[in-house]
């Protein structure tokens, strides 16, 4: 999918006609100017740079949420060896190896990665060394998590401390094995479905609203996982992408359009 083919481009062009704001596009439609504000990718000129930076750092997000008693999936920060000098304290391979011995299975991923790319499950030292070398070749830092079995994943979109949408990311009907790394990303084939259970909506909303308040972000999508009956924040995204959601059917397209309409109005006020 090229930048021009993104639904957000189509939606914003429609909204410009309906709402009467001017738009310009730059960088092959990756940047959209709306009146005197900018949308870069899926990041609206609504959030502070600090809040956005926290969201783009998986380990920092975990630390902040955990420090404020918000249940989140553990992410531990490790800098690549060539950049470790900037930490002011030593990090070494032994620390990572000890985590593998403790938890048996570890998940390794880029600390600022997106779209479920370059995520690896390891359960022995040879795999660990191989994956660490690969990741540190391409990324300055990684996040390491104890493996957890995820039963379900939800996305909650929040604007100005109000929940706008909650949907689950349902996996296609495939056989799953215990201790298997499963990606619930929509771009990897998961199917969005709006959550209608009122009790679940209340629980997810409560967690998401606490998370965005602590981070201080105005427009975000919060991913929450159900692991053995416990709800945990997986990550908070400062870029609100609804491409795959909006492509499911016309109803979902109009919902996404309504959220982007509200976000632009909030941005321009």
Regions found by a protein language model. Give the residues of each.
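Protein kinase-like catalytic core scaffold
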Residues: 106, 164-165, 232-235
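A short glycine-rich, hydrophobically flanked beta-strand micro-motif that places a catalytic Asp/Glu
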Residues: 142-146, 155, 217-228
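C-terminal active-site "lid" helix and adjoining low-complexity regulatory extension at the edge
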Residues: 195-199, 213, 226-269
């Amino acid at each position: 999918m090229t930048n021009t083919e993104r639904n957000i481009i189509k939606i914003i062009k429609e909204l410009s006609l309906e709402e009467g704001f001017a738009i310009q596009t730059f960088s092959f439609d990756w940047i959209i100017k709306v009146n005197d504000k900018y949308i870069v990718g899926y990041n609206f000129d609504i959030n502070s740079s600090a809040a956005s930076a926290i969201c783009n750092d998986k380990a920092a997000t975990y630390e902040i949420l955990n420090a404020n008693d918000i249940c989140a999936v553990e992410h531990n920060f490790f800098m690549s060896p060539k950049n470790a000098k900037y930490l002011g304290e030593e990090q070494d391979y032994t620390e990572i190896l000890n985590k593998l011995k403790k938890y048996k299975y570890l998940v390794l991923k880029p600390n600022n990665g997106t779209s479920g790319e370059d995520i690896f499950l390891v359960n022995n030292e040879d795999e660990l060394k191989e994956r660490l070398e690969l990741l540190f070749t391409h990324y300055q830092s990684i996040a390491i998590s104890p493996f957890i079995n995820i039963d379900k994943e939800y996305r909650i979109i929040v604007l100005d401390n109000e929940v706008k949408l909650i949907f689950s990311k349902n996996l296609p009907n495939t056989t799953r094995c215990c201790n298997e790394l499963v990606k619930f990303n929509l771009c990897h084939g998961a199917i969005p479905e709006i959550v209608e259970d009122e009790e679940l909506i209340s629980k997810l909303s409560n967690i998401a609203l606490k998370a965005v308040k602590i981070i201080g972000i105005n427009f975000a999508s919060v991913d929450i996982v159900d692991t053995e009956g416990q709800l945990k924040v997986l990550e908070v995204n400062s870029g609100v992408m609804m491409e795959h959601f909006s492509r499911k059917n016309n109803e979902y397209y109009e919902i996404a359009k309504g959220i982007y309409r509200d976000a632009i109005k909030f941005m321009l006020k």
